[in-house]
Amino acid sequence: MRTIAVLTSGGDAPGMNAAIRAVVRTGLEKGLKVMGIQRGYNGLINGEIFEMDTHSVSDIIQRGGTILRTARCEEFRTEQGREKAAKILKAFGIDGLVVIGGDGSFHGAQLLSKLGINTVGLPGTIDNDLAYTDYTIGFDTSINTVLDAINKLRDTSTSHERVSVVEVMGRNCGDIALYTGVAGGAESIIIPEKEYNADKLCKQILQGKLKGKMHNLVLLAEGVGGANELAKYIEEVTGIETRSTILGHIQRGGSPTCMDRILASRMAYKAVELLISGKSSRVVGIKNGEIIDMDIDEALAVERSFDQELYDIATILSK
């Protein structure tokens, strides 16, 4: 192993820069040449590859986003596109590739490994939707961003004695809504993993008002969607003024938290070690506080277990 490269793919997540920094500095310390690939698989196919040194990653650990940029790539979805990518990696003398991203990015790494490229994946996604790992890079920062937002929304909702419906990210995984719902004291949490009934929700809101609640906070994962429609329905049924807020891409930005910086650094260090040891088609994660690695195929096949206990706690504490 003489030369490794790193790319970021899919949606950006706070902590990606910390991971890039750790890959570069660990690789250099181990005597490797480290290359950066811009704009994910799209940049790989277009040959947007450059050599990195310690100065390339100076003063980036505190920055959100990714200095390598990220982009979608339709061409990489084709066999010809992947073969072109593999040839370019070999032409640059790259022996190993670290891919930072979500499940789609991992599928790409998996396919490249079948073309003879040593690959290791790092989980970089705010959704926390990769089942093989307890946490993904970016999740902690995202939930703290959301928590700050709902704290402010609670202030104005209380002042006006209204219902606030807040839509957060999470298509198939409701962890952002669940975690921030518990931490933010939400009265209702609506996530893809659990069915909900709008009429039952309205009844709960009315019961809360009878108990003296001055406001009501409803957290809604985008996988369920329809925050504007739900807010309108709640107001029609209950007669209580209701406002909707869709937080959107603000959840992906911002300086990463201490946890995300440390998690990214530990995972990236492990990724370089795996490549040096000759391992390929692996992903890195964290389980019970320990950094782990496993086969990409096995990782992608792991079924996600829903945290029923946390959901039950949220239900009890919201009453």
UniProtKB/Swiss-Prot annotation:
Record Pfam families: PFK
HAMAP family, alphabetized: Phosphofructokinase_I_B1 (MF_00339)
Residues binding ADP, per UniProt: R21, A22, V23, V24, R25, R154, G185, A186, E187, K211, K213, M214, H215
Pathway: Carbohydrate degradation; glycolysis; D-glyceraldehyde 3-phosphate and glycerone phosphate from D-glucose: step 3/4
Subcellular compartments: Cytoplasm
Binding of ATP, residues: G11, R72, C73, G102, D103, G104, S105
Active site: D127 (proton acceptor)
Cellular component, GO annotation: 6-phosphofructokinase complex
Subunit structure and binding partners: Homotetramer.
Required co-factors: Mg(2+)
Record keywords: Allosteric enzyme, ATP-binding, Cytoplasm, Glycolysis, Kinase, Magnesium, Metal-binding, Nucleotide-binding, Transferase
Protein family (similarity comment): Belongs to the phosphofructokinase type A (PFKA) family. ATP-dependent PFK group I subfamily. Prokaryotic clade 'B1' sub-subfamily.
Protein name as annotated: ATP-dependent 6-phosphofructokinase
Catalysed reaction equations from the record: beta-D-fructose 6-phosphate + ATP = beta-D-fructose 1,6-bisphosphate + ADP + H(+)
Function, in words: Catalyzes the phosphorylation of D-fructose 6-phosphate to fructose 1,6-bisphosphate by ATP, the first committing step of glycolysis.
Residues given in the record as Mg(2+) binding sites: D103
EC number: 2.7.1.11
Modes of activity regulation: Allosterically activated by ADP and other diphosphonucleosides, and allosterically inhibited by phosphoenolpyruvate.
Domain of life of the source: Bacteria
GO term, biological process aspect, one: canonical glycolysis
Residues involved in substrate binding: T125, I126, D127, R162, M169, G170, R171, E222, R243, H249, I250, Q251, R252
UniProt GO MF annotations: 6-phosphofructokinase activity; AMP binding; ATP binding; fructose-6-phosphate binding; identical protein binding; metal ion binding; monosaccharide binding
InterPro entries documented for this protein: ATP_PFK, ATP_PFK_prok-type, PFKA_ATP_prok, Phosphofructokinase_CS, Phosphofructokinase_dom, PKF_sf
